[in-house]
Amino acid sequence: MANRGEPDPKKSTESICSLTKPQLYSLYDDDVVRSEDNEIYEELKRSVSIDSTKYSRDQTIDSTFYLAHKVGGSLPRNTVSSNNLERILSASSIHENFPSRTRQTRQNILHYLQAVLILSLSGFAYHELSRNLHDNHLLHPDFASRPLLLGVKLCNWLSNGVLPNWLGYGVEGLLFGSVVPILDNIFQTEVVKSSVHHDSLTSVIRSINAMLGVTFGIRKIQWNSSLQAAGAWGLLNIILWLFFDGSISMLMSCICIGVGCCISCYKDIIDGSQFLYFMDFYFLGSLMFGKLGRYLYSH
């Protein structure tokens, strides 16, 4: 039996607890002694997993709590939800990504301007090549360049003769180089998707060299007739299309442009060899412009 002079250890423990903990501890558990602001701040950081390098998001959260303290004391727990936080951080993210989007837009504009310039210069060079293409029979100089005069006449008619002729040739080069990329976006065939690796700078240079070799070979070889030269060139064009590209959109573009050039100058065609001659030259030219346009618009 315990002596009356000795203190009861159970009562002593209860007295210490009543002195160190609030009286409402039994009702609210440890929420009374926990800092509410610190708890909300830690909870927000855990839920969003804020990166330490993106200091602007931390500043957004800190400024939110600062305004809340300044207006009405501590921020109530139920007013800070994940949706509100996502809105705040999304606004901060948009502000951070705005300079990069502006830079990307500027780069895209410069990229397309570069493509337009190169295609326009190629159109002018293509006209000069057509003027020097001939054989020793019916295919005389300047004969292949007649379809290109249609674009120049159209530009002069639209501008009342203000624009120079070389600008019309540049517009034709731009149109020739843009037909195949437009057809690629329209059809989106498996052949086009599988031939992306062919659209390289090396492939473009090879196609240009092939065109120059074929056109000047027509001039140097002694053909028995113009029909023989045009027929051999037509068979070679099919081989070059299969070797350099092989896509349906490229074939359709080359055929349509070749037929269109023949129709535009049907009054000047007096022999079947001349029809094939127009078809061969503009088929191969469309192949070269198609490769160049694909490369410029996709790189």
From Swiss-Prot:
Gene name for this UniProt entry: NSG2
Subcellular location: Endoplasmic reticulum membrane
GO cellular component entries: endoplasmic reticulum; endoplasmic reticulum membrane
Entry annotated with the keyword Transmembrane: yes
Protein name: Protein NSG2
Tagged with keyword Transmembrane helix: yes
One MF annotation (Gene Ontology) recorded for this entry: unfolded protein binding
Role summary: Stabilizes the HMG-CoA reductase HMG2 by preventing its HRD1-dependent degradation. Binds directly to the sterol-sensing domain (SSD)-containing transmembrane region of HMG2, promoting its folding to protect it from degradation.
UniProt membrane topology term: Multi-pass membrane protein
Membrane spanning stretches: 109-129, 162-182, 238-258, 269-289
